[in-house]
Amino acid sequence: MEKRILGLDPGLAILGFGAITCTPGLTQLQSTKVNILDFGVIKTSADIEIGQRLCTLFDDLHTVIDNLQPDVVAIEKLFFYRMSSTIVVAQARGVVMLALAQHHLPYVEFTPAQVKLALTGYGNADKSEVQEAVARELDLAEIPQPDDAADALAVALTAWYQM
């Protein structure tokens, strides 16, 4: 049975999303087919008041969810050294959680280290190694752009590996 997984890389300026479809083999020995359903970003302008930016994220994420109809959502967990960055991304994550709750969607969360480990086998891999692994796993000639969308696909793949 096909599963749709929506990966999200939350941010206020740019929220990356990447959706995959996964069709398991009939037995554990058979390979699993994983395909890209869609990927992209939701952007908000720094020129707009933060409340309006959060509304834009919320509305646009609803549209993405309605269009892609995921079975489960995978979200990258917060990990920042600067408090100001953490607060802004936490606000965006709150909007994400509200949208998921309104759609009654289950979600899983992964730290950046968990995503790196799942895709490269090494929890301290750099961003380019993870993005190359995404392209390889999804049989793409090029790394998906922008980076936030590639990161969201990495989170979706991590969820699939954990199922």
Swiss-Prot record:
Where found in the cell?
Answer: Cytoplasm
Which reactions appear under catalytic activity for this entry? Answer: Endonucleolytic cleavage at a junction such as a reciprocal single-stranded crossover between two homologous DNA duplexes (Holliday junction)
Q: What does the entry comment about cofactor binding?
A: Binds 2 Mg(2+) ion per subunit.
Which residues make up the binding site for Mg(2+) 2? E76
The UniProt record lists the keyword DNA repair? yes
Where the protein is mainly located, per its record? Answer: cytoplasm
What Pfam families is this protein classified in?
A: RuvC
Enzyme class, top EC level, equals hydrolase
GO BP term, pick one: DNA recombination
- Annotated catalytic residues: D9, E76, D148
List the GO terms this entry assigns under cellular component, sorted alphabetically: cytoplasm; Holliday junction resolvase complex
The parts of the chain that form a coiled coil are none
InterPro entries to which the protein is assigned, alphabetical:
RNaseH-like_sf, RNaseH_sf, X-over_junc_endoDNase_Mg_BS, X-over_junc_endoDNase_RuvC
NCBIfam families on file? PRK00039.2-1 (NF000711), ruvC (TIGR00228)
Quaternary assembly: Homodimer which binds Holliday junction (HJ) DNA. The HJ becomes 2-fold symmetrical on binding to RuvC with unstacked arms; it has a different conformation from HJ DNA in complex with RuvA. In the full resolvosome a probable DNA-RuvA(4)-RuvB(12)-RuvC(2) complex forms which resolves the HJ.
PANTHER family (alphabetical) = CROSSOVER JUNCTION ENDODEOXYRIBONUCLEASE RUVC
Q: Which family does it belong to?
A: Belongs to the RuvC family.
Q: What is the documented function of this protein?
A: The RuvA-RuvB-RuvC complex processes Holliday junction (HJ) DNA during genetic recombination and DNA repair. Endonuclease that resolves HJ intermediates. Cleaves cruciform DNA by making single-stranded nicks across the HJ at symmetrical positions within the homologous arms, yielding a 5'-phosphate and a 3'-hydroxyl group; requires a central core of homology in the junction. The consensus cleavage sequence is 5'-(A/T)TT(C/G)-3'. Cleavage occurs on the 3'-side of the TT dinucleotide at the point of strand exchange.
Know the name of this protein?
Answer: Crossover junction endodeoxyribonuclease RuvC
